[in-house]
UniProtKB/Swiss-Prot annotation:
Any single Pfam family the record assigns to this protein: Peptidase_M41
Organism field: Oryza sativa subsp. japonica
Binding, Zn(2+): 483, 487, 562
Region (Disordered): 1-52
Required cofactor(s): Zn(2+)
Cofactor note: Binds 1 zinc ion per subunit.
UniProt-recorded name of the protein: ATP-dependent zinc metalloprotease FTSH 6, chloroplastic
């Protein structure tokens, strides 16, 4: 039943039919309801009257729009006449009258759910009177029975109502327009008296965290292992504290400093240090905080950020992960209309555009993906300095360990210099995590000091994962032992490889066994062809031991990770380092080497199919030569390998010194290295 009919029924159901004594039917008496009492406004309503027009429009637009939309009025339907619907009859009694032939005429309303029938009632004073019957729909049996009884019946269709149509139009169009008008009215006049960002609800406001006197708790003394970057930042601090010292000779303050480096190398830590040392207002935010779902928000937030920064100049603005907003234009799906590109254009203008100037605002940005940044963002005048914060070397790692170990109780036997040598490729964050894991492990074991054992176990856990359950004696354990000893022997007997630090059968992560090497003191940025080839030989040593000892049918999938790493290194030798018979060519596309998916898709290979086939052949030649060298090591030193496997099966962990002592009983390691180098040279020149 529609709301209209429902209200009608409620009103008329209580009106009885009366008959006058004179024999005529009396008119229905209607009682006029008393007028609604008007309650004077309370104190709360007077307070509501004092609300601003902004809140009033917002409440009206949202409340009325949503409320009326949720309760949309139904279409007006034809209803039973009011004067004939006051007498009701149940459906079952109506059927009894119909079976008795006392029903003369039936009119159906409201899609067959209500019927007004003329009934011949002998018991009533008026033999024929009209009653209202509520029907359960319009059953087919009822229609058939009406036809059989010869009853005259008719259905009254829905009649449109002008009032309801007007209300529908108001709900569909009026309130949304009122809501939009309220937004347009309040945005420029109420929130933007200064002519700044004019987006509603503060969407155009920058989310940068502002600190007038930054108290980050970090100084340059807390930053270790990045001396070159510290020196550049200390100059920035001098620029901000004593600008007259540099302006006297015509120098200007650098507008921007871009920190580039892998994750965890201390870029954000450097920004915290300069904020704590400079003593000037500091704004900090992430590159992702510029972009929202609304168009124009990013550019508006950039304008607001620099307006606030210029008002507080001299000051620092730190944008972390700037690649979220500063990536190369034209690479996105949206092209030049992309919201990110509009934000970047506004950032370029604010830093050094027609409206930009030397306002004493220094922008510091950090990213670990400099290859995807827009070229216009990297030019001098915007980011005058580009500081590389790379992975620390041995000395840098030792300095970082000293900083993070200052508040920890270390055993006198712990040498941080040795720990630094054992952690090549560790970033500052990795080293901090290492010292924390060692402290947790010492507390778990009930020790009051961190010993070498906790340091070693923490390194293994960070690099390889959690320690698993030891394998039971059997063929699988023996196969893993031969595999790991094969790695260690082939690496030790090949010139240019690092020394073995330990060999273990204790599972960690997905690995059933591990062989650790201790890097030398050479510069890791300068690696020779001999060292790379030795690494490939050592990587294939496990597979070679499986094939020589157990036969080719017994080779397992345990070397899958080794093969992936070996193939990747060999391909880089050919395409990036020019260490093959193809020649000293750079055959790798820089864009294809990056991590950005869009740039990799857009990068076009400039090599022919024949050159690609030559590259594959050169990679295969390098891997095949290294595999033959590894199998030769295993065949010539089978007795030493068998003894080493027996010791490893018994102890499960074999130290580097003990390993070399047992191997030296069977072979002259130095002589074997020289002979291997000579054979490798012959293969390379053949």
């Amino acid at each position: 039943m529609s709301p209209t009919a429902m209200s009608l029924t409620t009103t008329t159901s209580r009106l009885p039919i009366c008959r006058a004594q004179g024999g005529g039917v009396a008119k229905e008496k209607r009682t006029t309801p008393p007028p609604a009492k008007i309650t004077p406004p309370s104190s709360s309503s007077s307070e509501a009257a004092g609300l601003s027009r902004r809140r009033l429009l917002q409440s009206a637009g949202l409340g009325l729009g949503l409320g009326l939309t949720a309760a949309r009025p139904a279409r007006a339907e034809a209803t039973a006449p009011e004067e004939v619907t006051s007498n009701r009859m149940s459906y079952s009694r109506f059927l009894e009258y119909l079976d008795a032939g006392a029903v003369k005429k039936v009119d159906f309303f409201e899609n067959g759910t209500v019927a007004v029938a003329e009934v011949d009632d002998a018991a009533a004073l008026s033999r024929v009177h009209r009653v209202k019957v509520q029907l359960p729909g319009l059953p087919a049996e009822l229609v058939r029975k009406l036809r059989d009884k010869g009853v005259d019946f008719a259905a009254h269709p829905v009649e449109p109502s002008a009032g309801v149509m007007l209300l529908d139009l108001l709900v569909n169009f009026g309130f949304p327009l009122l809501f939009v008008a309220s937004l347009l009215w309040r945005s420029p006049t109420m929130n933007n008296p200064g002519g700044g960002p004019s987006l509603p609800f503060g969407l155009g406001k920058s989310k940068a965290k502002f600190q007038m006197e930054p108290k980050t708790g970090v100084t340059f003394d807390d930053v270790a292992g990045v001396d070159e970057a510290k020196q550049d930042f200390q100059e920035i601090v001098q620029f901000l504290k004593f600008p007259e010292k540099f302006t006297a000779v015509g120098a200007r303050t650098p507008k921007g400093v871009l920190l580039v480096g892998p994750p965890g190398t201390g870029k954000t830590l450097l920004a915290k240090a300069i904020a704590g040392e400079a003593g000037v207002p500091f704004f900090s935010l992430s590159g992702s905080e510029f972009i929202e779902m609304f168009v124009g928000v990013g550019a508006s937030r950039v304008r607001d950020l620099f307006d606030r920064a210029k008002a507080s100049a001299p000051c620092l603005v730190f944008i972390d992960e700037i690649d979220a907003v500063g990536r190369q234009r034209g690479a996105g799906i949206g092209g030049g209309n992309d919201e990110r590109e509009q934000t970047l254009n506004q950032l370029l203008t604010e830093m050094d555009g027609f409206g930009g100037g030397d306002g004493g605002v220094v922008v510091i940005a950090a990213t670990n993906r400099p290859e995807i940044l827009d070229a216009a963002l990297l030019r001098p005048g915007r980011f005058d300095r580009r500081v590389s914060v790379g992975l620390p070397d041995v000395r840098g790692r030792e300095e970082i360990l000293l900083v993070h170990g200052a508040n920890k109780r270390l055993d006198p036997g712990v040498s941080l210099a040795v720990v630094a040598m054992r952690t090549p490729g560790f970033s500052g964050a990795d080293l901090a995590n290492l010292m924390n894991e060692a402290a947790i492990l010492a507390g778990r074991r009930g020790k009051d000091r961190i010993t070498v054992s906790e340091i070693d176990d923490s390194i293994d856990r960070i690099v390889a994962g959690l320690e698993g359950t030891s394998m039971t004696d059997g063929k699988s354990k023996m196969l893993v032992a031969y595999h790991e000893i094969g790695h260690a022997v082939c690496a030790t007997l090949t010139a240019g490889h690092d020394e073995v630090q330990k060999v273990t059968l204790i599972p960690r992560g997905q690995a059933r066994g591990l062989t650790w090497f201790l890097p030398g003191e050479e510069d890791p940025a300068l690696v020779s062809r001999q060292q790379i080839f030795a690494g490939i030989v050592g990587g294939l040593g496990g597979r070679a031991a499986e094939e020589v000892v157990f036969g080719e049918p017994e080779v397992t999938t345990g070397a899958a990770g080794d093969l992936q790493q070996v193939t990747r290194v060999a391909r880089r030798m050919v395409t990036a380092f020019g260490m093959s018979e193809i020649g000293p060519w750079a055959l790798a596309e820089p864009a294809a080497q990056g991590g950005d998916v869009v740039l990799r898709m857009l990068a076009r290979s400039s090599m022919s199919e024949r050159l690609a086939a030559d590259i594959d052949a050169a990679v295969r030649t390098i891997v095949d030569e290294a595999y033959e060298v590894a199998k030769a090591h295993v065949r010539r030193n089978r007795a030493a390998i068998d003894q080493l496997v027996d010791v490893l099966m018994e102890k499960e962990t074999l130290g580097g010194d003990e390993f070399r002592a047992i191997l030296s009983e069977h072979v002259d390691i130095g002589k074997e290295r020289r002979e291997t180098a000579a054979r490798t040279q012959q293969l390379a020149t053949a």
